[in-house]
Amino acid sequence: MFKSINPATGHVIETYSPLSANAANLLVGNAGSAAKAWAQVDVDTRAAMLERLALLLESRLEDYAQLITREVGKPLVEARSELGKCALLCRYYAAHAPGFLAEEQVNAAAKQSYLSYQPLGVVL
């Protein structure tokens, strides 16, 4: 059993059963299938999802801040600040990802050379 414990109070927040090897393998396989599908999603759609994530973090900021405080023991003001930074980071990558991931032509001996960024898939 795994327990999530509030470090400030010692109160058990939740108890989790460990996964069997079969269940873990199934989850990794599902993640691999999802990664292949996700790799087909264009960068503008992904950027829009990051923007939606920023909005979600902001709309649920207090709930998530309370959860961080309970599970990690971080002061509430710091948890709120951390979530605000996460929302800003989502917006930053939403705005800049198309440029970061664009193919780049490079000078090389070959007739045509370029850098192309491709998803790695599931990383454990």
What residue ranges belong to the model's regions?
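N-terminal Rossmann-like NAD(P)+-binding subdomain of aldehyde/semialdehyde dehydrogenases
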Residues: 1-114
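Solvent-exposed alpha-helices and their adjacent loops that cap or buttress functional pockets
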Residues: 115-119
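Structural motif
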Residues: 87, 120-121
